[in-house]
Amino acid sequence: MVDPVEARDRLIVALDLPDVRAAEAMIARLDDSVTFYKIGYQLAYAGGLPLARALKAAGKKVFVDLKLHDIGNTVARGVESLASLGATFITVHAYPQTMKAAVEGRGASKVKILAVTVLTSYDEADLAQAGYRLGVRDLVELRARQAKELGIDGLVCSPEEAAHLRGIVGDGIKLVTPGIRPAGSAAGDQKRIMTPARAIAAGADYLVVGRPVTEAADPKAAADAIVDEIVGATT
């Protein structure tokens, strides 16, 4: 069985914002509607990593999404440093050596390591252009099996693949899905997308949502609406 998670905790809002001040303003607007935030490249490189500690101190959860991929020692030490921020989730690319190093670097910390299978902005043509012989579905499945064998805690995958992956990895691995777009939202640069309710029904444990919340006229109302969809899909 998947650990029970409150509906509100299953929404992760991506703070893809230009600086810490903008992120803090968004967090204040969202108030108690959001309990889980993601810090990615844009905010991290603008000095946003210390915000992870502040969010944890405020009782929030933090997903530091830097998709580590380097030589083993560098990945292991990077995981060690990110774990010290108090992050709940961190990401690595789903290459076997990278995943193995990340698990070793975690040590005794409680941080959960998520492996990114194939970016949700990629489709079959993108993989072919990059020289991959496998299509999206086959590559995602291969990486999911490898991740499970190496002790990875969760997978970042398209909601389109969630149901298939759940059958492969079982209930012990968390499925975290970006590419979430509420009905009527623009797809933007995402190609493999799904609504919140459909993603939960497909087996996703956590939904990562950025622009549909942070660029909404009323971000708090947008977040609440997504949580309502999650509740509806789980009752």
From Swiss-Prot:
Q: Is the keyword Lyase assigned to this protein?
A: yes
Q: Extract one GO molecular function annotation from the record.
A: orotidine-5'-phosphate decarboxylase activity
> Which sites are catalytic?
K67
Its function, per the record, reads:
Catalyzes the decarboxylation of orotidine 5'-monophosphate (OMP) to uridine 5'-monophosphate (UMP).
Arranged from A to Z, the UniProt key words for this protein are:
Decarboxylase, Lyase, Pyrimidine biosynthesis
| Record's protein name | Orotidine 5'-phosphate decarboxylase
GO terms in the biological process aspect are:
'de novo' pyrimidine nucleobase biosynthetic process; 'de novo' UMP biosynthetic process
Annotated substrate binding lies at 16, 38, 65-74, 120, 181, 190, 210-211
Has keyword Transmembrane helix? no
Domain of life the protein comes from = Bacteria
GO cellular component annotations, sorted alphabetically?
Answer: cytosol
Pfam families assigned to the protein according to its UniProt record, in alphabetical order: OMPdecase
Q: Which organism is it from?
A: Rhodopseudomonas palustris (strain BisA53)
Pathway(s): Pyrimidine metabolism; UMP biosynthesis via de novo pathway; UMP from orotate: step 2/2
UniProt xrefs under HAMAP family: OMPdecase_type1_B
Family stated for the protein in its record: Belongs to the OMP decarboxylase family. Type 1 subfamily.
| Known partners and oligomeric status | Homodimer.
Matching entries from PROSITE patterns are given as: OMPDECASE
What Enzyme Commission number does this protein have?
4.1.1.23
**Catalytic activity annotation:** orotidine 5'-phosphate + H(+) = UMP + CO2
